Structures are given as structure tokens and as C-alpha cells.
Curated annotation (Swiss-Prot):
Organism: Sinomicrurus japonicus (Coral snake)
Single Gene Ontology MF annotation: metal ion binding
Cofactor(s) named in the record: heme b
UniProt keyword Cell cycle, yes or no: no
GO cellular component, one term: respiratory chain complex III
Keywords: Electron transport, Heme, Iron, Membrane, Metal-binding, Mitochondrion, Mitochondrion inner membrane, Respiratory chain, Transmembrane, Transmembrane helix, Transport, Ubiquinone
Chain residues that bind a ubiquinone: H193
Gene that encodes it: MT-CYB
Protein known as: Cytochrome b
Length: 372
């Protein structure tokens, strides 16, 4: 074990003195993961992975199990908070050029994909109307795979439709994947501390470092406490804020909801999927909406790592954030004008960020050379 890892364990790791609050979300994500694993374990004790009993078992947890309603609500709200933190974490990485630490960025992208899969499997487990139909629609995208599509879909379903084997399989995957996420998180942290954390200026922090504890550990505690306060306020006053009303009805394969949609944190990808009127094209765009993050280190052309001193790049970045919110909003709307056109335009803007960013980098380099 290297000296860096010994320092990491003893919490004395030297860290740049100027890292801001945006660097606290990593520890908040780790706290969320621990909380989700613990609450998920207690829920799994009382949950029954059977299409006839799953919905009733969730009601049983809420009504009859001591403090079951707290466990269930923390787990459901915790998933949304988890995704809020991870999207901020990724946005911070894009803004400050942290993707230049390639190994950390790639392990983080793998973590995001695993997390999204885990959350999707978890959304199906209550076996409500939206759970069932979201599972049917999303898994049906596997049929878009040329030649093997139908075979892969039947194998994934465990039959010829979303049924009992599908639910049992999803429960097994939802139980085991968080431990995969925990393992990947360990790799992510070890890779990060091989080179050390960057800072808002994007410069080398070696000349000005302070011990992680107590300076940054107290900042982490403050942000984690704020996160818990937000969670418990939602739990106390608006426990169903992130829930879909359709999911309070038991799954019925004979009645299709008027508007099928996944949880809010998948809506940006779902909106991109819906904006393309071709099944294979939409599926590829859905996958690309997440995997395109892998291209960031290879398309960085600017001489300056961070966007702190790049006003043009900042404009492009905030356009991406606005686009992300717009796609999320349009995905909640029916597939009809003007939402179809807005969704298609927003999808083009979303992907154009990853094309415009390197072009803007070259432009900024030229401007800097002209002024120097």
C-alpha cells in the first residue's frame, strides 16, 4: 500500500486549500450509498418478490412493520437525493476539467451506468402500474438489437413478457448491484488519490496543501448534515414528492397508463429516446446520452483546464444545464406538439455541447495567443 493510501485511511491526506463546496458531493454520495444499502436491507427482509404479493408487501411495510414507513420513504427519497448529488458531481467535473484525470473519470462513468441500472431495477420492485409499464417499455428496447434482439429480450424477461421471473431477477440484481457500486467507489477513490484532487483554478495544488482533517472533514460534515435536513424535511412534509400517482395502483397488464414515464432522474435520457422516431436510433441516443461523457478527456483542446477563466466555455456549460432541465421537463409531457419539437431541439443542443466544447477550446487558444 502506498503512502498516499496510508494517509487516506488515517484521514490526514494533504488536499489543496482552495477546493470549494462543489468538492463535498463525493462524500455526500458515499453517505447516500451507505444509507441506501442499510435501508434497502431492512426493506428486503419484509419484501416479497412475487407479482401477486410485491405490491401488498410494500403496503405491509408501510402500514404494519414498525418504522417501515420511515425506511421506505428514506429509501425512495434517498434515491432522488443520490441522483441530485451525482448530477452536481458530474457537472462539477465538466466545469472544472476534472475529466483530465482519465482513470477517475472512466471509473466514475462506470459507476453512473451501474447506479442507473440499480435505480431502474429498484423502480420496478413495488409492482405498481408505472413500475410495470416502465419495465415493459425500457426492457422492450432490447428488441432493437439487430438479429439477437428478440432472443436477448426473452432471456432477460425470463419468458415471453414481463412476469414473475423478471421481478425476481430484478430484485436479485437490485440487491447485489449496490455492493458492486461500493467496490467501484473504492476503486474510484483510490484512483483519485493516486494523483490527488484538483481545484477550482485547475492548477497544481502541491504548493498549497493542508490536511484533509479537520479542515475539509468539517466541511463534509456540514454538507452531509444539510443533505439529511433536506431529506427529513421532504420525508416529514412531502413524502410522496418524487412518487408517480400511477404507482399507487397495482400493476395491471390490461390497462396502459395514459403517459408512461420513468423516475424523474431518468427523464433526460428518456426525453432523448422519445425525440427520435426510430427505435434503434432512439435506443442508441439513449445509451449515448450517458456514455458520451467518456469522450470528454479526448476532446479537451483548451490550454486552460478549468472553465473558471473561460467565459465562452461557461456560457456553453450553462446552456448544457438549461438543456438538461428542458429535456427533463419535456419528457414529463405527452408526445404531441409543441413538446416533440422542443424535445428534439433540446436533444440536439445536449449532444452539440460535446462537439462545440473542443471547437471553443481552439477558438479560445487562438484569442489567448493573439493577446499574448
Amino acid at each position: 500500500m502506498s503512502n498516499q493510501h496510508t494517509l487516506l485511511i488515517s484521514n490526514l491526506l494533504p488536499v489543496g486549500s482552495n477546493i470549494s463546496t462543489w468538492w463535498n458531493f463525493g462524500s455526500m454520495l458515499l453517505t447516500c450509498l451507505m444509507m441506501q444499502i442499510m435501508t434497502g436491507f431492512f426493506l428486503a427482509i419484509h419484501y416479497t418478490a412475487n407479482i401477486n404479493l410485491a405490491f401488498s408487501s410494500v403496503i405491509h411495510i408501510m402500514r404494519d412493520v414498525p418504522y417501515g414507513w420511515i425506511m421506505q420513504n428514506i429509501h425512495a427519497i434517498g434515491a432522488s437525493v443520490f441522483f441530485i448529488c451525482i448530477y452536481i458531481h458530474i457537472a462539477r467535473g465538466l466545469y472544472y476539467g476534472l475529466y483530465m484525470n482519465k482513470n477517475v473519470w472512466f471509473s466514475g462513468t462506470a459507476l453512473l451506468i451501474t447506479l442507473m441500472a440499480t435505480a431502474f431495477f429498484g423502480y420496478v420492485l413495488p409492482w405498481g402500474q408505472m413500475s410495470f409499464w416502465a419495465a415493459t417499455v425500457i426492457t422492450n428496447l432490447l428488441t432493437a438489437i439487430p438479429y439477437l434482439g428478440a432472443t436477448v429480450t426473452t432471456w432477460f424477461w425470463g419468458g415471453f413478457s414481463v412476469n414473475d421471473p423478471t421481478l425476481t431477477g430484478f430484485f436479485a440484481l437490485h440487491f447485489i448491484l449496490p455492493f458492486t457500486i461500493a467496490s467501484l467507489s473504492s476503486i474510484h477513490i483510490i484512483l483519485l488519490h493516486n494523483e490527488g484532487s484538483s481545484n477550482p483554478l485547475g492548477t497544481n495544488s502541491d504548493i498549497d496543501k493542508i490536511p484533509f482533517h479537520p479542515y475539509h472533514s468539517y466541511k463534509d460534515m456540514l454538507m452531509t448534515t444539510s443533505m439529511f435536513m433536506l431529506m427529513f424535511m421532504i420525508l416529514s412534509f412531502m413524502p410522496d414528492l418524487f412518487n408517480d400517482p400511477e404507482n399507487f395502483s397495482k400493476a395491471n397488464p390490461l390497462i396502459t397508463p395514459q403517459h408512461i414515464k420513468p423516475e424523474w432522474y431518468f427523464l433526460f435520457a428518456y426525453g432523448i429516446l422519445r425525440s427520435i422516431p426510430n427505435k434503434l436510433g432512439g435506443t442508441l441516443a439513449l445509451l449515448m446520452s450517458v456514455t458520451i461523457l467518456i469522450t470528454a478527456p479526448f476532446t479537451h483542446t483548451s490550454l486552460v483546464r478549468s472553465m473558471t477563466f473561460r467565459p465562452l466555455a461557461q456560457t456553453l456549460f450553462w446552456t448544457l444545464i438549461a438543456t438538461f432541465i428542458t429535456i427533463t421537463w419535456t419528457a414529463t409531457k405527452p408526445v404531441e406538439p409543441p413538446f416533440i419539437l422542443i424535445s428534439q431541439m433540446a436533444s440536439v443542443f445536449y449532444f452539440s455541447f460535446f462537439i462545440m466544447n473542443p471547437l471553443l477550446g481552439w477558438t479560445e487558444n487562438k484569442i489567448m495567443m493573439m493577446n499574448s
